[in-house]
């Protein structure tokens, strides 16, 4: 599970601090050097780590902290608070249109799990009482339409497809179909690429213009580490993403890349089976508790 390695290393640092009793400024700075290394090894970006350690150090070396009866606990508390601040604001709820259908455009690189996550999201929304429609707008990848039909079938959600027609036309027709047949949510599965290119972005921009999506969800592979942050930035610059769905996060024990776009993070699923996978919504406080288990009075899950 994500953050396991980071959690273990940070807690080792805190155990050392607690064993010393009274702390000096030198003790705190040495601990922060170890924290810095642990964060970098967990795939947190260099700039984020630098700013984080600077903020913690400035607060932790103050006379009030070092002179307290429990200085180590004070330092742990400061690290926890700075972690929560680092995560920023996250809104896990879908922005629903005031007048249906709500349009959700899915985007991402090929192999990120975009099509599967489109079906998982559709199943989740159907379970919540909605009537979603999946639109097959990936006409390039072999068997992409068939894959969406298969996963859509497992989610018990209808799939709108027009074969190898222009994806922009398909998206526009799917929106009209959703309106005509009472689907209150349209999820558009767009084409991915092996890497970001101009043609991919132009197509997404044109689909966005035609459908005016309420949400633009980027699916990123957590296993790609900091590359996931770079991918998120590229898509955000091009089309303005409103949310991120992370795939394979339960396979990565580092998890630090998530800090780069936590404010966008909406859902994370455990397992690949459409009918049995478990979804989670993000909580920045829960992440901080998971990373710093020393401070937690009870056991917290990564995403409660």
Pin down the residues of each PLM region.
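Primarily NTPase-proximal linker/entry elements flanking Walker-type ATP/GTP-binding cores
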Residues: 6-137, 144-164, 170-180, 184-190
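C-terminal-of-GTPase-core extension/linker across diverse P-loop GTPases
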Residues: 80-93, 181-187, 193-195, 253, ...
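Short, glycine/acidic-enriched loop or turn micro-motifs at the edges of active sites
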Residues: 139-141, 192, 224
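Conserved D-loop-proximal element of ABC-family nucleotide-binding domains
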Residues: 142-145, 196-197
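Conserved catalytic-core segment of NTP-binding enzymes
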Residues: 166-180, 195-283
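Short linear/disordered segments characteristic of secreted peptide precursors
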Residues: 298-299
């Amino acid at each position: 599970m994500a953050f396991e390695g980071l959690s273990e290393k940070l807690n080792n640092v805190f155990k050392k601090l607690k064993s010393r009793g009274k702390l000096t400024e030198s003790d705190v700075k040495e601990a922060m050097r170890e924290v810095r290394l642990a964060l970098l090894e967990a795939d947190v970006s260099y700039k984020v780590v630098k700013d984080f350690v600077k903020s913690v150090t400035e607060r932790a070396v103050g006379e009030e902290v070092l002179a307290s009866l429990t200085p180590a606990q004070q330092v742990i508390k400061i690290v926890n608070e700075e972690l929560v601040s680092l995560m920023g604001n996250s809104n896990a709820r879908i922005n629903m249109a005031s007048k249906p259908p709500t349009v959700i455009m899915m985007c991402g690189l090929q192999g990120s799990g975009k099509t599967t996550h489109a079906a998982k999201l559709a199943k989740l929304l159907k379970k919540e009482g909605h009537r979603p429609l999946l639109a097959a707008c990936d006409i390039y990848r072999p068997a992409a339409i068939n894959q969406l039909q298969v996963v859509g079938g497992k989610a018990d959600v209808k799939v709108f497809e027009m074969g190898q027609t222009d994806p922009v036309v398909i998206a526009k027709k799917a929106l009209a179909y959703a309106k005509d047949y009472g689907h209150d949510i349209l999820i558009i599965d767009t084409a991915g690429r092996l890497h970001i290119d101009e043609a991919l972005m132009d197509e997404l921009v044109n689909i966005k213009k035609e459908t005016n999506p309420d949400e633009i969800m980027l699916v990123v592979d957590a296993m790609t580490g900091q590359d996931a942050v770079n991918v998120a930035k590229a898509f955000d610059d091009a089309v303005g993403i409103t949310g991120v769905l992370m795939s394979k996060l339960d396979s990565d024990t580092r998890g630090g890349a998530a800090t780069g776009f936590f404010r966008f993070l909406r859902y994370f699923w455990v397992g690949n089976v459409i009918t049995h996978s478990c979804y989670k919504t993000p909580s920045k406080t829960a992440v901080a508790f998971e990373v710093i288990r020393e401070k937690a009075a009870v056991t917290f899950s990564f995403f409660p």
